Curated annotation (Swiss-Prot):
Annotated function: Interacts with TGF-beta receptor type-1 (TGFBR1) and inhibits dissociation of activated SMAD2 from TGFBR1, impeding its nuclear accumulation and resulting in impaired TGF-beta signaling. May also affect FOXO, Hippo and Wnt signaling.
Record key words, sorted: Cell membrane, Membrane
GO biological process, one term: negative regulation of transforming growth factor beta receptor signaling pathway
GO cellular component term of the entry, any: plasma membrane
Organism: Mus musculus (Mouse)
Subcellular location: Cell membrane
Family note: Belongs to the MELT/VEPH family.
Region (Interaction with TGFBR1) location: 201-319, 663-833
Protein known as: Ventricular zone-expressed PH domain-containing protein 1
Primary subcellular site in the record, as a coarse category: membrane
Annotated membrane topology: Peripheral membrane protein
Tissue specificity note: Specifically expressed in kidney and eye. In the eye, expressed in retinal pigmented epithelium but not in the neural retina.
Signal sequence, renumbered to the chain: none
Summary of the knockout phenotype: No visible phenotype.
Length: 833
């Protein structure tokens, strides 16, 4: 052991203890283990708790030892001695006798805890430390337990297996009120599900007492548990989840858990379907997830299939465009599983991708009739088909041409089906060599024949006027079966335009089509039937939505770009456009996505005023598209909102929102750089950062939970040190005065010097600070390379740090403290209201 350590610890000489900090870290590194063992002997003595001299010596030595370990990165070498001293603290009293008064051994435990558990990513250290850390959860003071819980939560991220053996102890601590440890349970559940399952009902009972982040971690635990397909867990958690589904904060997360359960235990949700319908009406944006639950329950048996289909069909007619795809998928999946529900009409109904309202009407009508007609459908079909053949043959003498056409259509359908499963099958067909007159003839003849084909296929007995109407309607339906734009959707078992864009109405939509004499079919039609059908299928009349079509062709690129840009530029939670004297500005509001316990922006917002609103609107549009599995249309609610914002900023004669988004979908690189530069100038990145783990922008505290315990202690300095303050009493004299500043609580304090020229030592109140920023580079000279300014309502302060790195540290800490002050004020207002 180093001679100075031997002197200080052997003789307990407090006067020499301070000299330990004059020694180089490398000089004493080999002595640290022996010094720790000597400290253990001193702290275990009978009179230690009453001997102030011994306590002071031990505290100074531990501070010097932990500093040397950190600087030399030798934690693994000295871990056993550290843990041994830490463990010895458990043999003594750790609970304070008075308020805010730690016992001597609690102080030792706290110092060693931060040294050990900050190395939560080092396995050898954590193997030794975790068993002792769990013991402290039940023996330590409230503050010690809270800090321990923070460190164990970090350890669970990378070393969950080390905590798994202590799951029972962790649960016991949670049930005793240490809810912070709930974040550990999802990580250890895979290793030790049984203890958690045994106490699941008790954990769920805590929900109403928990804070928002703790509730989130409890729901994460249920999601992990649901994936294990344990029947006992399902029975316990489904009623709980349904009860909490009306909470808009969590209903999206809860529905994802219910979808997981519906995948393997659909009957568990059957009795709750009426309640799910009510919630879907209250929160329409949940329709897509609700559809998946109803789709899963609908696969149980035919009775439940009919019940679920009625709900899904009603939603198909009422919901906005983005939900049509998932609704159709679930409807088709159920009708495929129980083919008797729709019978032979299923194929033609689902072909009609150009009108979801009509699909819903047809499905509803068929659901009403199918139950009553199911017993006699076969007989009715056999009788009606010959009658219809005779009736139609009298009107359609050119049956030979019709038969040839059907062969061509079937061949083309087979070809499209084959190509739709092959990568790169988006080949375009054209009829450039055919005249307009021939095209009209082709389209007319094709439509007639497809209408005839549909009536023959359906074979339902109807009156003549009904035949005419249905023939016209189904002629346009059939085209969607060979819609080439649907080839990229591999999940669909049927060919349909899942995006719901109505196709061009052919001449078959007119009721008189069947009674019109067929024109002679040109020879070119026989050679180019595929190209003409494809051209007709991709030429909308009713749905002239260029934005939708553009996004459909570039959806994968748009989503990939949106995901990438979201890491560089944050997406505002709210945006308003305000008129100024010169132009329009965008007022943007940013909040933290996690909203943790110490969140800087859970109740308040970071507000940014931008002189460039259009790039922000463009970024928000791309973000909106990334949230939906299907292309957005100009009629979508979110797009309409962004369009309204765009129009407020639009110059006379400039491109409309739809044109701008189609011609220049992605913002210019220089525009993005300007957005980032502006965010830097307003110090946004001091208080926000992108979390790769969460995939979202979070505030400084939520991104760095390990710092929360230090930052949030009242009176504890957030940062302190020397700064030079510019004296501006006489502006023609450039003079700097050095003071020792401390940023703590809600104030920036400094000590008044002896000179009469020194300002009063009145603190700078953070509540009065309007903004903080670095001195702009264009204003910097040799005297201001690392300066920053603080603006209050009555004064401007200019400070200079020792270097640029130190200036950045001060700026970030001041901005964090400012955000905390505003958040605290916002919470107080909320509480008062």
């Amino acid at each position: 052991m180093h001679q100075l350590f031997r002197l200080v610890l052997g003789q307990k000489d407090l006067s020499k203890a301070g000299d330990l900090f004059s020694l180089d870290d490398a000089e004493i590194e080999d002595s640290l283990t022996e010094a720790l063992e000597q400290i253990k002997v001193i702290s275990s003595s009978l009179d230690y708790q009453t001997n102030n001299n011994d306590q002071a010596v031990v505290e100074i030595c531990i501070t010097r030892i932990t500093t040397a370990i950190r600087e030399t990165e030798s934690i693994e070498k000295h871990a056993r001695a550290l843990v041994g001293l830490w463990d010895s603290c458990l043999e003594h009293n750790l609970r304070p006798a008075g308020k805010d008064e730690d016992t001597p051994h609690a102080k030792i435990a706290s110092d060693i805890m931060s040294c050990i558990l900050q190395n939560y990513n080092r396995t050898p250290v954590m193997v030794l430390a975790v068993p002792i850390a769990v013991k402290f959860l039940h023996r330590g003071s409230k503050e010690l337990c809270r800090n321990m819980s923070n460190y164990l939560s970090l350890a669970a991220i990378t070393k969950a297996d080390l905590l798994a053996d202590h799951t029972e102890g962790i649960i016991k601590s949670i049930l005793q009120g240490n809810a912070m440890l709930l974040r550990v349970l999802p990580a250890v559940y895979e290793k030790q599900p049984q203890p958690i399952n045994r106490h699941l009902a008790e954990l769920l009972a805590l929900m109403s007492q928990l804070e928002q982040t703790e509730q989130y971690h409890l729901l994460r635990l249920l999601h992990v548990a649901a994936k294990r397909k344990d029947v006992e867990v399902v029975q316990k958690c489904v009623p709980f989840l349904i009860r909490n589904l009306k909470d808009s904060t969590y209903n999206d997360i809860i529905l994802n858990i219910l979808i997981e359960i519906a995948g393997h235990e659909p009957l568990a949700l059957n009795s709750f379907l009426p309640m799910l319908k009510e919630i879907a009406e209250q929160f329409p944006y949940l329709t897509g997830q609700m559809a998946r639950i109803f789709g899963a329950v609908g696969h149980v048996d035919e009775e439940r299939a009919r019940s679920c289909l009625r709900y899904l069909v009603s939603q198909l007619a009422n919901m906005e465009h983005p939900f049509h795809h998932i609704l159709l998928l679930e409807i088709k999946s159920i009708t495929d599983a129980f083919s008797s529900i729709l019978g032979p009409h299923s194929r033609d109904i689902f072909r009609m991708s150009n009108s979801f309202t009509n699909i819903a009407k047809l499905l509803s009508r068929q659901l009403e009739n199918s139950k009553a007609d199911s017993s006699r459908r076969k007989t009715s079909t056999e009788v009606s088909i010959p009658e219809k053949l005779r009736e139609l043959n009298s009107m359609e003498p050119e049956s030979e041409d019709h038969e040839k056409l059907q062969v061509k259509i079937q061949a083309f359908e087979d070809k499209i089906n084959a190509e739709s499963n092959t990568p790169g099958s988006g080949r375009r067909y054209s009829l450039d060599h055919i005249s307009k007159e021939e095209r009209k003839s082709i389209r007319f003849s094709r439509s007639r024949s497809l209408a005839l084909n549909t009536v023959l296929t359906n074979g339902v007995s109807v009156e003549d006027n009904e035949v005419e109407e249905k023939a016209g309607m189904h002629a346009s339906i059939s085209l969607s079966q060979i819609d080439p734009l649907s080839h990229g959707i591999g999940k669909l078992p049927f060919k349909t335009d899942t995006h719901g864009s109505p196709l061009r109405n052919s001449s078959a939509s007119h009721p008189s089509i069947i009674h019109t004499e067929p024109e002679t079919m040109p020879e070119t039609f026989k050679e180019n039937i595929q190209e003409e059908i494809l051209e007709a299928a991709t030429s909308p009349i009713e749905y002239q939505d260029k934005l939708y079509l553009h996004l459909r062709e570039n959806l994968s690129k748009v989503k990939a770009y949106a995901l990438e840009i979201a890491k560089k530029v944050p997406i505002p939670d709210q945006c308003t456009i305000e008129d100024t004297m010169r132009s329009c500005v965008a007022k943007l509001f940013f909040t933290c996505s996690l909203k943790g316990h110490y969140c800087l922006y859970s109740k308040s917002s970071f507000i940014l005023v931008s002189q460039a609103p259009q790039p922000w609107i463009q970024v928000m549009f791309l973000s909106q598209q990334s949230l939906f599995p299907e292309p957005l249309s100009i009629q979508s609610g979110s797009v309409q909102f962004l369009k309204a914002l765009w129009e407020k900023t639009q110059d006379t004669g400039a491109h409309s929102f739809e044109v701008a988004m189609t011609e220049s979908t992605f913002p210019q690189q220089k525009d993005l750089e300007q957005l980032q530069l502006h965010l830097e100038e307003v110090r946004f990145f001091d208080v926000f950062g992108f979390s790769e783990t969460a995939g979202a922008w979070q505030c400084f505290m939520c991104n760095n939970p390990e710092k929360a315990t230090v930052v949030n202690q009242d009176g504890q300095p957030l940062i302190e040190g020397k700064l030079k303050e510019k004296q501006v009493r006489w502006k023609f004299i450039k003079r700097w005065k050095t003071h020792y500043f401390t940023l703590a609580g809600n104030q920036l304090l400094f000590q008044k010097g002896k000179s009469k020229d020194d300002p009063d030592d009145s603190p700078i109140e953070l509540s009065k600070v309007q903004s903080v920023k670095a001195v702009a580079k264009k204003r910097r000279d040799r005297s201001l390379p690392r300066a920053f300014e603080i603006f209050t309502d009555s004064k401007t302060y200019v400070f200079k740090a020792k270097d640029e790195k130190n200036a950045e540290e001060w700026l970030q800490c001041i901005n964090v403290a400012l955000a905390q002050a505003k958040e605290r004020e916002s919470r107080e207002v909320t509480t008062y209201l």
